[in-house]
Design a protein with these regions (language model features):
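Short amphipathic alpha-helical segments and helix-helix/interface helices
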Residues: 56, 80-84, 106-110, 138-142
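Core dinuclear metal-dependent hydrolase active-site scaffold
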Residues: 3, 10-12, 18-85, 89, ...
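Conserved strand-to-helix beginnings and helix N-cap segments that scaffold or border functional pockets
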Residues: 78-80, 102-104, 131-135
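Binuclear metal-ion centers of metallo-dependent hydrolases, dominated by the metallo-beta-lactamase
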Residues: 50-51, 117-174
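Proline-aspartate-enriched helix->loop->beta-strand connector
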Residues: 1, 86-89, 99, 103-123
Length: 174
């Protein structure tokens, strides 16, 4: 990776072991030919009063608008909705916990932003729930996303910007 996009620098996040170029603060940044837009959103369900604010990232790459909301847990204001709306690809946390959207919250954000492709993150894969982890699996999110088809993938996949699967959720199995 050439750089790291992080949502926050909390003690359990934003780890940068190789001291790579890392973007974490809200703002507009340019890396080579990619313009990164970091938008501040609550990192909790209390308007940021518990865990502060997180950074949600949006950028264009290969003619695709990409939004990454892995570190968001709170509501997004109307200005952020306008900036983030209609991405080709939306990465969004769905597993719940104290610092990320649960399946109900994530499905509401998807309905507001209207992405073509959704890639869920921050959830427990499979049916096994780990006692020491406050994430759940993606079942609740998928239950709320009846208008989307679901495709299960291996470790990687390619997207053709000229032929995007509309209303599709991609879930990585590994």
């Amino acid at each position: 990776a050439d750089f790291i996009l992080a949502s926050s620098k909390l003690a359990d996040e934003g780890y940068n072991p190789n001291n790579k170029l890392m973007f974490v603060e809200p703002g507009i940044y340019k890396f080579q030919d990619i313009l990164l837009n970091g938008i501040e959103v609550p990192h909790d369900r209390f308007g940021g009063r518990r865990f502060g604010m997180a950074t949600v990232w949006s950028w264009e790459q290969n003619n695709l608008k990409i939004v990454h909301m892995g570190g968001a847990a709170g509501e997004i204001d109307i200005n952020s909705q306008i900036i983030l709306s209609r991405p080709d690809i939306l990465f969004i946390s769905v597993g719940g916990g104290i610092k990320s959207y649960n399946g109900n919250e994530a499905s509401q954000i998807v309905k507001i932003l209207k992405p073509s492709i959704v890639i869920p993150v921050h959830f427990v894969r499979g049916k096994n729930i780990i006692d020491s982890c406050d994430f759940s699996n993606a079942d609740l999110f998928l239950k709320n996303m009846k208008d989307f088809k679901v495709k299960y993938l291996g470790k990687k996949f390619k997207i053709n910007s000229k032929r995007i699967d509309k209303n599709t959720i991609y879930i990585f199995k590994d």
